[in-house]
Amino acid sequence: MKYVRCVLLTGALFNIAAGLKCADSKVLSRYKVSQHAAKGKFTESTPPSETTDFWWINLCEEHSEPVPDKCKDDAMFCHRQQVKLDDGKEYVTQVFDVPRNQEVDVEELRDGFQVSFTGKWGERERKVKVRYTCADDKAEDEVSAEGAFGAHTTPVEVALRGPSGCIQATEKSSGIGGWITWLVIYAVLLTLIYLLAKSYMSVGHGSMQDFREEFVERSTNLVSSLPEFAKEVMGKVVGGGPSSRGGYSAV
């Protein structure tokens, strides 16, 4: 597969141990990859036979899904090639799987992230690169690959497009909205502290009943003045000038 890698300036390679929860990874924990396993199937006419490649990827151990036929039970990645002859008989010709105890490199990209790892296929070691990109409109990840698996000198490159490459909803909702929420909370707390302090100073050594009445009165006055205050502020913001107020008559 050919693509241009656009690495974020703040992005770095994070090395984690495969089999650990994706929640423990600084990058993977931001995405929905722990909620899905991806699988793909590609059939090609190879006279006098028909060749089918099956791909299966379950990167995070948080997501439980049965491993496909012929793949090892501890696999997080599996490729199986199957040949169907013209007489209808089918034979599995290749199986390449990578166990969960293999180390995984995680790289955050501009439009998703990429994981890479190495597995053993017979006497050879094969490098695998899997790139995840977001597609909110898809319920499952679409898997695509380029080039013949038998090209031993090149990495196995697989692309996943779907929900796994999308950022978690909690991450999307953070930002300016989150800051505004905290500012409102702090404003309410500071106002409450101010009212309590002023009420206490006003009653001095009075009873608890006096303190409560003073606090309720101050709080009521504050709440009742908020609409007029907001109206005055909005008037100044939109250029209407200060609100009209009645003055005091000289006696």
From Swiss-Prot:
Keyword Mitochondrion: yes
Membrane topology per record: Single-pass type I membrane protein; Single-pass membrane protein
InterPro entries linked: Autophagy-rel_prot_27 (IPR018939), MRH_dom (IPR044865)
GO biological process terms held by the UniProt record: cytoplasm to vacuole targeting by the Cvt pathway; pexophagy; protein localization to phagophore assembly site; vesicle organization
Lumenal topology ranges: 20-175
Transmembrane spans: 176-196
GO-annotated cellular components: clathrin-coated vesicle; cytoplasmic vesicle membrane; Golgi membrane; mitochondrial membrane; phagophore assembly site membrane; trans-Golgi network; vacuolar membrane
Compartmental location: Cytoplasmic vesicle membrane; Golgi apparatus membrane; Mitochondrion membrane; Preautophagosomal structure membrane
Pfam families, A to Z: ATG27 (PF09451)
Coiled-coil features, chain-numbered ranges: none
Domain MRH: 20-168
Disulfide bonds: C22-C60, C71-C78, C134-C166
Cytoplasmic side: 197-251
Region forming the signal peptide: 1-19
Keyword field contains Iron-sulfur: no
GO MF annotation: an example: phosphatidylinositol-3-phosphate binding
Keywords: Autophagy, Cytoplasmic vesicle, Disulfide bond, Golgi apparatus, Membrane, Mitochondrion, Protein transport, Signal, Transmembrane, Transmembrane helix, Transport
Homology family: Belongs to the ATG27 family.
Entry protein name: Autophagy-related protein 27
